[in-house]
């Protein structure tokens, strides 16, 4: 039984002893005074029911839920939530106001029922009406239609809050000080759980597909993942020596890899000094034996291994570079480890106020797009960062320069972590470098399933028996066959 109902019953029992002792005369049934007392009793029961329903209905509406309805609900829901929001913001004052007037109605009910009914009848009626009319029915209605009921009665709530202000406001402030305010926002883990619950795979009626839930979860996890988790290890990266020749063999390897950018190293593959844009080789003739150093080599930015992927993505999307060398910083540093470093030939590096990176990936393109950016004689371990550019960095340029290159990270690597799936194109040799799953394996499975498919769904061969026959493939290899899936070198992830 509700505590207030127990108080009502106790008062009615106390009224029995008092009436028996005083032998007071009951008010005649049907008289004006009886009708007045009966009307007041009915009003108190209904008023108590409204207060009880509003307490449950309004207090169950969270601030986040109301903001969501204001932004994405129907026009009716937007109007209702906008009307309720200012009242629900004062949660403790609203709670004290509703409970105060609910208690007043419950306390006043026995006083009037005792004057118009027999004591035993008054107890039965009081408990019954208070339980069903004052508690069960209002709360059941407001649980389902709390938004609509609250919006229609918000004017009454405002009046009651003004009337009870001298009492409710001090108590509400005390509750705010003691209990504090509830945090209406969700944490990252809670958002991921909420998204997964709304997915179709959860079987709870959600509309989000598996791809949608996967991408949203990947976006939430991206801030916690670092460059080392997404990079391609330097041992598995295809790169070129700066002193090597761009002969036919080298050009065939570059073409077979199918990458748009190739890291360039000096002496040691871990000593990455820049990157080569493959499109700059269009004018290079293999028979001339041009050195890699004679082609436009662009500087490659360096990032610490523990740099968050969101910081890398923010710099990649500026368009200056889509590849960076991941460096394992030797020195220990304080603060957030998100520093991006690049080798600069004389220019002053400028740091953006909105970025924790040391400098933009490329500050300036000298001349045309094929101009040489890196000076080979100054590329080994030197740094040209101004004092202004060093301010506010977690890692100094010297620490990054002295660090060992452990891998290469590209924009595609970041997207794969975002999508949580491997991106495979027609030139990739491996689906997953770490698991070493070859693309050819997947292609063989696809061809096998295609061969078992009905003739109407096959991509090769005539649709009908009367059509032209498909010519047999020649057993003699073509000159370009060695470029298609014959590379057995280490896997690579630098696109």
Curated annotation (Swiss-Prot):
Domain CNNM transmembrane: from-to ranges: 30-212
Residues listed as glycosylation sites in the UniProt record: 349, 353
GO-annotated cellular components: cytosol; membrane; mitochondrion
Biased composition (Low complexity): 456-477
Stretches assigned to the Extracellular side: 1-42, 114-120, 168-495
Primary location: membrane
Region (Disordered): 330-354, 455-495
The protein, known as: DUF21 domain-containing protein At4g14230
Phylogenetic placement of the source organism: Eukaryota, Viridiplantae, Streptophyta, Embryophyta, Tracheophyta
